[in-house]
Amino acid sequence: MLTLTSYFGFLLAALTITSALFIGLSKIRLI
């Protein structure tokens, strides 16, 4: 269970960071 929870936590963090970077690049392109 602990390994599964850690995996989902890492996956969620990676997804959040990727989304943040994508949004940042989109804003830079718009400017």
Swiss-Prot record:
GO cellular component: chloroplast thylakoid membrane; cytochrome b6f complex
Keywords attached to this entry: Chloroplast, Electron transport, Membrane, Photosynthesis, Plastid, Thylakoid, Transmembrane, Transmembrane helix, Transport
InterPro entries: Cyt_b6/f_cplx_su6
Pfam families reported in the protein's UniProt record: PetL (PF05115)
GO terms classed as biological process: photosynthesis
Record has Membrane as a keyword: yes
Coiled-coil regions, chain positions: none
Compartments reported by the entry: Plastid, Chloroplast thylakoid membrane
Membrane topology term: Single-pass membrane protein
Major subcellular location class: plastid
Family that this chain belongs to: Belongs to the PetL family.
Record text on subunit structure and interactions: The 4 large subunits of the cytochrome b6-f complex are cytochrome b6, subunit IV (17 kDa polypeptide, PetD), cytochrome f and the Rieske protein, while the 4 small subunits are PetG, PetL, PetM and PetN. The complex functions as a dimer.
Physiological role: Component of the cytochrome b6-f complex, which mediates electron transfer between photosystem II (PSII) and photosystem I (PSI), cyclic electron flow around PSI, and state transitions. PetL is important for photoautotrophic growth as well as for electron transfer efficiency and stability of the cytochrome b6-f complex.
Protein name: Cytochrome b6-f complex subunit 6
Species of provenance: Phytolacca americana (American pokeweed)
